[in-house]
Amino acid sequence: MFGRNFPFFNSIGGFYPRDSLDPRKPSGTGYTSKVRVRDKYHIVGFISSGTYGRVYKAIGKDGRKGEFAIKKFKPDKEGEIIQYTGLSQSAIREMSLCSELDHSNVVQLAEIILEDKCIFMVFEYTEHDLLQIIHHHTQPQRHAIPAPMIKSILFQLLNGLLYLHTNWVLHRDLKPANILVTSSGAVRIGDLGLARLFYKPLNSLYSGDKVVVTIWYRAPELLMGSRHYTPAVDLWAVGCIFAELLSLRPIFKGEEAKMDSKKTVPFQRNQMMKIVEIMGLPRKETWPGLVAMPEFSQLQSLAMARGHLNRQSNLEGWYQSCLKNNGYSPTSSAGTPGPEGFDLLSRLLEYDPLKRISAQEALEHPYFTTGTPITANCFAGYEGKYPHRRVTQDDNDIRSGSLPGTKRSGLPDDSLMGRAAKRLKE
């Protein structure tokens, strides 16, 4: 399925064969047996933990150059007894997809190691992520992310997404914490734990995973209970990320209603309301498939209760206010996203998934083809410095079988405390 000669956009706009992509990609990607992690890697420290397990920073040994992030999957645990009952569906998906995917804007897997019934995924190390970058620009004095940097980040993100979609892969969990950035300014789409092949699925995608995409980045068709969805769900998330890069805060910051004991998926009323407040009420005249959505009656109830029946889109007003508050020029220039930025944002945040812009179309949008040229290094021209990812020596034993089941926050950097650390609460 993942052809070795697939052509794709590179990060400066051309096409070239897939194999010529990135000579830095470690060779021998795949499963390695009877090899101990510490024989091949020096563990520098602990990065983060979640429901999946733990992530450590490491340096290669014996001629294996470079820095790596080692993801150790947690075995099932009951009390003090480790139960080796197999891997989660998320872990299996991530391993199988990352072993096949090969693109400069998708996280790069070096190898998979099995040691003492524990699975380790060894990735290239990335120093930053978009959540960390956004947080930095809110501290200590709020200052906007430079417009050329946003353009480069967004182009590289869409470039990687085009590759995934062309190879029939939906990411389904795009959010700032999952968009990684190397110290040289290369953007990588990370965390493919919810990714899914969508080429002629035997069952609807809904039947396998009823809840996908972190709530603030979840497309309206998912909120409306759609049983079948498309790559358009990822493009809506890109629109939300674009808006967040501009405003330094989530554009649709709703509260998630949790599933009940019967695992019934509730209507996300608060999140839908946050979208309606900016985008206006979706209408069947512009979204013909709306009336067939399982939660259509809930939407009507929300609109009547909140007085939103005649609410029109205020996205342009939000955009202009965002430009003004963050010091961007309202007209086209090197220092502003301009009207082209608004047009792209509005097409990414299109209610009807059939009308929503695709990754291919977005890459050809005037926002990218006019104005400031796109740089392969998103940090090019930026004189500031972003803090390094926090790596601690606490709990630094990668061999430890006792892995606490801490709540997965999606935060790859433990240094993001306070308000920013709460933003990705799921």
From Swiss-Prot:
Function, in words: Component of the srb8-11 complex. The srb8-11 complex is a regulatory module of the Mediator complex which is itself involved in regulation of basal and activated RNA polymerase II-dependent transcription. The srb8-11 complex may be involved in the transcriptional repression of a subset of genes regulated by Mediator. It may inhibit the association of the Mediator complex with RNA polymerase II to form the holoenzyme complex. The srb8-11 complex phosphorylates the C-terminal domain (CTD) of the largest subunit of RNA polymerase II.
Gene for this chain: ssn3
Organism: Aspergillus clavatus (strain ATCC 1007 / CBS 513.65 / DSM 816 / NCTC 3887 / NRRL 1 / QM 1276 / 107)
Active site (UniProt): 173 (proton acceptor)
CDD domains: STKc_CDK8_like
Protein's UniProt name: Serine/threonine-protein kinase ssn3
Keywords: Activator, ATP-binding, Kinase, Magnesium, Metal-binding, Nucleotide-binding, Nucleus, Repressor, Serine/threonine-protein kinase, Transcription, Transcription regulation, Transferase
Subunit structure: Component of the srb8-11 complex, a regulatory module of the Mediator complex.
GO cellular component annotations of the record: CKM complex; mediator complex
Catalytic activity: L-seryl-[protein] + ATP = O-phospho-L-seryl-[protein] + ADP + H(+); L-threonyl-[protein] + ATP = O-phospho-L-threonyl-[protein] + ADP + H(+); [DNA-directed RNA polymerase] + ATP = phospho-[DNA-directed RNA polymerase] + ADP + H(+)
